[in-house]
Every structure is written in C-alpha cells, then in structure tokens.
C-alpha cells in the first residue's frame, strides 16, 4: 500500500519546465494564461498565442489557444505524461481553463454588456476545440471551479460595484 504524501509546498514550475515544454510540443511564442490543478491531480495549462489581428476591442481580439494536460507523479516530483488539446483560434480573451467532464470550460474574467446583450464569456469546448455552448457568467470573475456534476462556481473580484463595460444595472445570475 502507498504511503500518504505529507503536505508540503511544491513549486510547480520547478517540476514542469515550461521552456522545455514549449520546445518539445512546438508551443514557442505562447504564454501561460492559466494553470490549475484538478481533483484528479492533473495540472491543466491554458497556453495562448496572441493574434497579430486586433479585434474591435480587446475582449474580442482573437488568440490561438492550446489546453495542456499534465499527469504528474507528485511524490517523485516528475512529469509522467503531457497531452495537448489544440483549441484553435478563438475570438475572445480567455483567462481560465477548467476540465468539465470530457470537455473544457474556457472563461474570460471580463465581459461587456452591449446593445444586444452581454458578451458570452463562458464557452464549453470539446477536446478538439469545437464550441459546444456559450453563455455569460458576468464581469469581474476572480476564479472558478467546475464540480463533478458540472455545476460551475465562480467568485468575483469587484462584486459588481463598478459598472464597467456597460454593466450599469444590477444583474443577478441564478441557476
């Protein structure tokens, strides 16, 4: 039987060499937009290759995204397996990647409220980047998790007090 691992701080990027990852997986020029450790112990990175094309505003400027799933041996502090999921060129600025069953949740922290309604800053995408659904989770997102049953929990950094990006009326998001 395996001995339990005693809790200690493990500097993630001393285990995962980002420069080596970029070279070996042909991700040169990408930036780490998000990293997250899931319930199953896998580490997920959202890698972004910014586009040279400017959108009508910064929220809609397209970028090419890749989800990276890394299986670690936490006790030995080594990478066991790395899997890439190219998500393609997407016309929104995403800040969070969360596994959601066999799919991914891509989430933008900021979104605007426009004449025709709010930006859809939450996208469920397949592992090959096909957009399965889009919806709005509001502006000013601090963090998020996706529960095993698919429930999305978000926290917000400004509690909606600023009214930025056209959000000048009170909105309540409820399930």
Predicted regions and their residues:
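Recognizes the extracellular SEMA beta-propeller fold with strongest preference
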Residues: 100, 106-127
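A short beta-strand motif characteristic of beta-propeller blades
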Residues: 19-26, 78-88, 129-136
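Beta-propeller blade signature
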Residues: 60-74, 118-129, 168-174
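Repeated scaffold domains used in trafficking and secretory/extracellular systems
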Residues: 26-40, 86-101, 136-149, 175
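Blade-loop segments of beta-propeller domains
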Residues: 52-111
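Sequence/structural signature of beta-propeller modules
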Residues: 1-74
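Short, conserved, GDST-rich strand-edge loop motifs in beta-rich repeat architectures
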Residues: 47-62, 107-117, 154-173
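Hydrophobic beta-strand positions that form the internal "hydrophobic ladder"
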Residues: 43, 104-105, 152-153
């Amino acid at each position: 039987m395996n001995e339990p691992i005693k809790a200690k701080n493990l500097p993630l990027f001393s285990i995962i060499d980002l420069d080596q990852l970029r070279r070996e997986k042909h991700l040169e020029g990408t930036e780490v937009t998000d990293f997250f450790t899931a319930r199953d112990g896998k580490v997920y990175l959202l890698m972004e290759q910014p586009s040279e094309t400017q959108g009508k505003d910064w929220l809609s400027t397209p970028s090419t995204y890749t989800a990276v799933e890394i299986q670690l041996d936490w006790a030995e502090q080594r990478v066991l397996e790395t899997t890439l999921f190219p998500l393609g060129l997407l016309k929104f600025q995403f800040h969070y990647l969360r596994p959601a069953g066999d799919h991914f949740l891509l989430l933008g922290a900021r979104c605007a409220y426009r004449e025709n309604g709010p930006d859809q800053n939450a996208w469920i995408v397949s592992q090959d980047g096909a957009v399965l659904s889009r919806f709005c989770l509001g502006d000013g997102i601090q963090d998020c998790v996706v529960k095993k049953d698919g429930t999305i929990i978000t926290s917000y950094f400004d509690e909606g007090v600023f009214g930025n990006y056209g959000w000048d009326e009170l909105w309540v998001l409820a399930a």
